[in-house]
Structure formats: structure tokens, C-alpha cells
């Protein structure tokens, strides 16, 4: 299709070049009838060029990948997410892709991602964890690299119990920052928990980069601890976090 589009481009270009020269030589004969014919040639050529250009744009638009919210994630997508994380920190701070995919298979709301074509370019991990995991995160003794499915809390179970939320990762490729993508993904993530939002009391982040810490500050988090693996632990009320997400307009410091 790309070659066909290129051939179309060449044909349009040739027509755009040849038609004026043809009209020029017709006019050069000096006859009024030929001048009228030249005008018709130019007008027809212009219409053809415009139509061909519109058709070419349509063809290219149909074939070009578009930025979209990924409907169904595969394990390959989680491998792409891990590769994005690896650009910023080491493997000892990255959840193995197969494990993160297990989270998603059991609780699809754990991961919201944006893709360009089939390539993940941004994602958010937000979910409740069990009380002991949350407390270990808060006191800095737990590295979520080791977090498994067993450590996640089922938001539909124990309807009277509070939920302890963990914003595990927020990452957007640099080329896609400044588009409001991070805020949009966060908004979609918190929408999933609206039915149980009254049970969501606190939310925590574990930041291994300065950019991550700055992101947490901008979204209302306050530092509570430095972890045993030298990351910065931030926390706030969940309702306050939701308000920051909904109220954010200029916050495009993506981590």
C-alpha cells in the first residue's frame, strides 16, 4: 500500500508539472480557441490534482497508526511496558511482565494503557493491595518488584472493608507528553473504582526517579518515607488524589 501511495504521489506530481506546460504551449499558438482550450486544460488538471491529493490523504490516513486506548492487552504489551520502564530504572524495580499480566488477567482495571498502533506508549497501574502490603510499602520495607497477584486486594470482596490503593506506575513516552495523555489515563483508571470509591481511604506511590517524585508532588502526594531500596514513598487521601486528577489542566510532568 505504501508503494501504491508513492506511485499515486508521483502521478499527481507529474500531472501538476505537465499540465501547466501543456497549457503554455497551447496558448503560445496565439489562437483564441486555443486559449480557451488551455483554460479548460488547467481547470481540469487542477480538479484532478485536488481529487488525487484528497484520495492519497485518505489512503495514508487509513494506513497510519493512531493513538488509542488499548482495549485488550496481551503479554507482549506488558513486555513493551517493562521495556519502557527499563529506560528509566533497573530490573530490580520492575515487576516481571508475566506477573503484571497475571494481575491484568484477574483484575483488568489494574492497567490502563495507550498505544500507537500495537506499540504501548503510555500506561497507568492503579489497584488496591492488601493491608499488610500497603503498610510494608508505607514503612519502606517492600519493593513492588516482588509484588504478586496474591498481594492484590479484590475490590469486590469484603464490601465493608477499606481499600488501600497503590499507584504502582505512571509512565508516558517523551514523544507523547504534553498531550494530556497521563491525566486521561489516570481519569480512566479512577473511573473503574468509582463504585467502591467510598471505601478507598489512602493511596501511595513508590518513586525511584526524581521525575516520579515530582509527579507525585504535583498530584498532591506528600513524602512519608525513604525506602530500603532508596526510593521515595509518597501518600495522600484517595479523595484528594481524585480531586487533583479531575482538577489537573497544566500538569504534564509525566513519569
Q: Where are the language model's segments positioned?
A:
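Hydrophobic alpha-helical core bundles mediating ligand binding, dimerization, or RNAP-core interactions
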Residues: 81-86, 100, 186-189, 216
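Short amphipathic alpha-helix that is part of the acyltransferase structural core
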Residues: 63-98, 106-135
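Conserved acyl-CoA
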Residues: 155-160, 184-201
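Hydrophobic, helix-forming membrane-interacting segments
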Residues: 1-61
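Conserved acetyl-CoA-binding loop-helix of GNAT-fold acetyltransferases
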Residues: 169-172, 177-193
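Terminal substrate-recognition subdomain of acyl/acetyltransferases
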Residues: 12, 59, 63-65, 170-171, ...
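Short beta-strand micro-motifs in enzyme catalytic cores
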Residues: 110-112, 122, 163, 230-235
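Conserved acyl-donor/pantetheine-binding loop and adjacent beta-alpha core of acyl/acetyltransferases
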Residues: 125-169
Amino acid at each position: 500500500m505504501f508503494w501504491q501511495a508513492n506511485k499515486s504521489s508521483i502521478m499527481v506530481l507529474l500531472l501538476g508539472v505537465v499540465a501547466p506546460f501543456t497549457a503554455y504551449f497551447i496558448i503560445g499558438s496565439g489562437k483564441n480557441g486555443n486559449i480557451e482550450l488551455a483554460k479548460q486544460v488547467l481547470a481540469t488538471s487542477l480538479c484532478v490534482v485536488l481529487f488525487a491529493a484528497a484520495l492519497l490523504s485518505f489512503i495514508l490516513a487509513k494506513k497510519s497508526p493512531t493513538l488509542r486506548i488499548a482495549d485488550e492487552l496481551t503479554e507482549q504489551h506488558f513486555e513493551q511496558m517493562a521495556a519502557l520502564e527499563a529506560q528509566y530504572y533497573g530490573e530490580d524495580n520492575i515487576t516481571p511482565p508475566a506477573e503484571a499480566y497475571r494481575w491484568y488477567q484477574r483484575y483488568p482495571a489494574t492497567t490502563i494503557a495507550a498505544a500507537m498502533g500495537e506499540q504501548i506508549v503510555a500506561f497507568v497501574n492503579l489497584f488496591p493491595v492488601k493491608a499488610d502490603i500497603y503498610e510494608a510499602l508505607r514503612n519502606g520495607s517492600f519493593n513492588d518488584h516482588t509484588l504478586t497477584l496474591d498481594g492484590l486486594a479484590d475490590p469486590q470482596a469484603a464490601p465493608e472493608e477499606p481499600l488501600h490503593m497503590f499507584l504502582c506506575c505512571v509512565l508516558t513516552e517523551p514523544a507523547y507528553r504534553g498531550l494530556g495523555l497521563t491525566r486521561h489515563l489516570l481519569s480512566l483508571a479512577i473511573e473503574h473504582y468509582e463504585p467502591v470509591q467510598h471505601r478507598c481511604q489512602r493511596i501511595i506511590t513508590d518513586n525511584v526517579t526524581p521525575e516520579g517524585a515530582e509527579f507525585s508532588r504535583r498530584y498532591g502526594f506528600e513524602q512519608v518515607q525513604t525506602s530500603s531500596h532508596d526510593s521515595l514513598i509518597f501518600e495522600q487521601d484517595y479523595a484528594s488524589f481524585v480531586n487533583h486528577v479531575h482538577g489537573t489542566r497544566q500538569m504534564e510532568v509525566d513519569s
